[in-house]
Every structure is written in C-alpha cells, then in structure tokens.
Design a protein with these regions (language model features):
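Extracellular structured ligand-interaction cores
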Residues: 142-144, 202-206, 219, 303-305, ...
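Active-site ExK catalytic segment of metal-dependent nucleases
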Residues: 148, 185, 223, 319-323
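Active-site nucleotide/adenylate-binding loops and adjacent lid/helix of ATP-dependent enzymes
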Residues: 88-205, 210-213
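C-terminal active-site "lid" helix and adjoining low-complexity regulatory extension at the edge
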Residues: 265-290, 294-301, 310-349
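Generic recognition of flexible, low-complexity loop/linker segments
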Residues: 193-196, 293-295, 304-307
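ATP-dependent carboxylate/phosphate-activation module, predominantly the ATP-grasp catalytic core
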Residues: 197-198, 202-287
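Conserved N-proximal alpha/beta basic substrate-recognition cap immediately N-terminal to
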Residues: 7-135, 292
Length: 349
C-alpha cells in the first residue's frame, strides 16, 4: 500500500512540475470527456501523458478495455502460438529449428537443475554455479553470457555475467538464478552505429505486426528502445527510453519517451552519451522488416510485438510477445486508434 501511495505521489509531482502541462481546467474537461467516451476511469490519461500540450487527439489512445479486448481476443490469438511466444526457451528453440536468427542457446535451467550439452547437472551453491559458468565461458570462448527468465517480462529476471567480474556477479545473482527457470544465450555483438547511441545494453526495435482477414501481414508501427544509466537492459519498464521510428526510412523521429514512474522525460539526446536522436538511421532496417514478416509466417498469431536487435551482421530476433500492453507503442505512435488498420483490429477482436 505504501509503495502504491509513494508511486501516486511521484506521479502527481511529475504532472504538477511538468512545464508542458495543459491548464488544470482543460485537463479536468478532457478527463471527463475521456471517461464518457471510453466508459472507464481514465487513469491512462495520465500514464500516457495525454495531459501534455501537444496532445489534442487524446481519444485516439487506447483505453484499458480496448487493450484487453485485443490481448484477450481468441480470434486474434491462438494458444498454439501464444504457448511458444510466452516461453522464451520454446521460442528460441523454434526459431533455431526454422533457421531464423536468434542469440545462440548455451544452456538452460529449471531452478537447480541445469541442462548443458545433453547432460543434466544439479547445482546447489554459489561455488558450484561459479564453477559451472566459468566452465561454459572457457569451453565456448565467451567473455560474457546473457541469462533471462523463461517466462519473465519487462527485463525482469535478466542477468549479464562476465568473465572479468564473474565471482562478484555470482555472489550477487546466484540466489535468483537458482530460484528461477532461465535460458542462457550468447551476447549479441551489437552494431557499432547503435553502440554510438548507448553501448551498455542491447537496444532493440519493437515491431507490432497484424495479420488481416485476407492473411496479409502488416507492420503496424516501430519504435526503438535504449538503456540508460549503465543499465544492460533497454526495457521501458526498467527505466529505458524509447523513440518512434519512421517505417519507410528507418530513422528515429521526435523526442524520446519514458514511463512516468521513471520521470517521463522527453529528450532530444541520450542522457548518457549526448547522442542526438533525430534522424538517426537504424542499420539493416529493411532487412529487419523482411525478417519480421518471415517470422510471422512461421508464428502466425494475428497480433505480435517483436523485439529485434541489430548485430554487426544484420537483424536478430530476441523475442515475440502476444500479451502486449500497448502502452509504449500507443505513446510512440501518437494514438494507435488513428492507425488505418486499428478499426479492423477492434472489429476482429
């Protein structure tokens, strides 16, 4: 309860201090209108920054009911696809089986049971885990290894272990690693141009795809995420920032966005590197779009959010999500309901 109250106080403080805020009377008027139109308490009005001066089309943003209508739709989502998408191990194995590029699987674990090179090992202590990871790094000639929860979301349950600091990192993360189910993968060698923006995290592009009733695959939108403050994850729910991407040119556009609980800042430059976002052209962008459409043909759930990384050799699929909250893409697009296909999506839901 105290955590929720503190979060509410922080949000109120951010709204009051926001120099780009509309007048309180206008905000109140729009809240009532949004409430009537959407038929629900308009908490998304603040969470999606619809109180800011540049937002005049606030009713074009999805309500929680509209999001639930899409994400819970049995017409748009099928269990046989979502069961693969929601299990990161199954997803990576399925992609590998169909020769679609994903970070190479090294091993995986179910709590203290580890599966490596067709062997099952029981690991029950920090020392045993250290010895095991050290062995993997040496046998695979790896400097780092990335670990993520098989069912986690939003950067939760992710760890980056390095040969250089392995002892310290194992002491810090062993308890969590041994208490969850994880997939261990090679670290992607990120493209140098993307590293110029922020080098400490794997910065991914989120593509939303939709298969219409004629089985045509559409890319609805794209935005790119970057980590901040030394973080090795780029997720907005972990404090990262994100920007809209022009689907035709592959260039970043506008200022960055950030979730309100992390300050909701709008920036022209990355806060750590001072790299100017506007018009940065993403390498291998056309290849990324082609890869996404190919991936959809192998996993034809009708709406998926795909995360794509850009390596020095081309795009790599990180994961797909059928249970998209649509908060970040809705903000990045500037109101998803103005998209020409969203009327059809809601009708099909």
């Amino acid at each position: 309860m105290n955590k929720k109250l503190n979060l509410l106080k922080k949000r109120i403080s951010i709204i009051i201090r926001d120099k780009n805020r509309k007048g309180f009377f206008k905000i109140f008027k729009e809240i009532i209108h949004f409430w009537i139109i959407k038929k629900e308490v308009p908490y998304f009005y603040f969470g999606k920054f619809l109180y800011r001066k540049e937002i005049s089309n606030y009713c074009d943003y999805l309500s929680s009911k509209e999001v639930d209508r899409i994400t819970l739709s049995k017409n748009l989502h099928k269990y046989q696809y979502s069961s693969i998408l929601r299990n990161k191990l199954s997803f990576a194995l399925y992609m590998e089986e169909n020769n679609l590029p994903v970070p190479k699987i090294v091993c995986f674990n179910y709590k203290n049971r580890f599966y490596y090179n067709s062997n099952i090992l029981s690991i029950n202590s920090e020392d045993e885990l250290f010895t095991f990871i050290q062995k993997i790094l040496q046998e695979r000639s790896l400097k780092k290894i990335f670990i993520k929860s098989i069912t986690g979301m939003g950067g939760e349950g992710c760890f980056l272990l390095s040969e250089e600091n392995l002892k310290i990192e194992i002491q810090k993360y062993a308890r969590e690693i041994l208490s969850q189910e994880s997939i261990f993968q090679n670290v992607v060698d990120q493209h140098l141009e993307v590293n110029k923006v922020y080098p400490h995290s794997l910065n991914t592009i989120r593509f939303d795809t939709f298969i219409d009733k004629n089985n045509t695959i559409h890319i609805l939108s794209a935005f790119m995420r970057f980590g901040c403050g030394g973080s090795f994850v780029d997720n907005g729910s972990s404090g990262g920032i994100y920007l809209s991407v022009d689907l035709d040119t592959g260039k970043l556009k506008g200022n960055s966005h950030q979730l309100m609980k992390y300050g909701g800042k709008q920036l022209e430059k990355h806060p750590d590197t001072n790299f100017v976002f506007e018009s940065f052209e993403i390498p291998y962008f056309q290849e990324s779009k082609d890869l996404i459409k190919k991936a959809v043909s192998y996993l034809p759930d009708r709406i998926i959010g795909w995360d794509i990384a850009i390596s020095k050799d081309g795009p790599i699929i990180i994961e797909g999500n059928d249970n998209n909250s649509f908060i970040t893409p809705d903000i990045a697009y500037g109101g998803y309901l103005k998209h020409p296909l969203f009327k059809e999506i809601l009708e099909e839901a």
